[in-house]
């Protein structure tokens, strides 16, 4: 007999304690500067709602969501199950017509510089022996002995060339090095493969 009544009484007791603690807390906040906090008043919390109002609002929102979901399910069930396709005559397809840019042909990549005239930058002058067009550049070729391949990788200042050597002031004489390569074994007990 006590087994069925005891949980009910316990629930009623807990709900009374929670309700009375909310009333005490709300009443103490109205005292302001005369509270137990020693003259400091932080004011009411902005945006804080009471527990009772929040549950009622949540309950109403939950019921509205359930009604909306039920209405969606009702209308969804009314739809036919097969897919509806558009008529092919009603579709409009966009045709892409290729037109090349003015002054360019389809084989533009093959002839990059046919008749390109060189216009120097402002403030620069062309030397008399410098080629003016790419056709003249093919005729003007410096001697391969004059071209040092190392100047491509190292140039001290733009427009100047320098014979770069590994150590300044020294030139390597390759004639003095032996033509055959000498193989030396290591002192470790490793075996060569």
Swiss-Prot record:
GO terms for molecular function: neuropeptide hormone activity. The modification Isoleucine amide is found at residue 46. It comes from the Eukaryota. The keyword Transmembrane does not apply. PROSITE patterns: PYROKININ. InterPro entries: PBAN (IPR008730), Pyrokinin_CS (IPR001484). Residues 124-158 are annotated as: Disordered. GO terms for cellular component: extracellular region. Juvenile hormone seems to allow PBAN release, which then induces pheromone biosynthesis. Belongs to the pyrokinin family. This is PBAN-type neuropeptides. It comes from Agrotis ipsilon (Black cutworm moth).
């Amino acid at each position: 007999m006590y087994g069925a009544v005891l949980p009910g009484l316990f629930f009623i007791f807990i709900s009374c304690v929670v309700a009375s603690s909310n009333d005490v807390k709300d009443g103490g906040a109205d005292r302001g500067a005369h509270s137990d906090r020693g003259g400091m008043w932080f004011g009411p919390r902005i945006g804080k709602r009471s527990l009772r109002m929040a549950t009622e609002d949540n309950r109403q929102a939950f019921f509205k969501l359930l009604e909306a979901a039920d209405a969606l399910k009702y209308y969804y069930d009314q739809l036919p199950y097969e897919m509806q396709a558009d008529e092919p005559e009603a579709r409009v397809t966009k045709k892409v017509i290729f037109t090349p840019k003015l002054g360019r042909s389809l084989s533009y990549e093959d002839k990059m510089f046919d008749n390109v005239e060189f216009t120097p930058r402002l403030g620069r002058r062309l030397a008399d022996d410098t080629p003016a067009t790419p056709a003249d550049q093919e005729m003007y070729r410096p001697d391969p002995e004059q071209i040092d391949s190392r100047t491509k990788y190292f140039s001290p200042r733009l427009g100047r060339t320098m014979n770069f050597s590994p150590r300044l002031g020294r030139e390597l004489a390759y004639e003095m090095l032996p033509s055959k390569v000498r193989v030396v074994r290591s002192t470790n007990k490793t075996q060569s493969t």
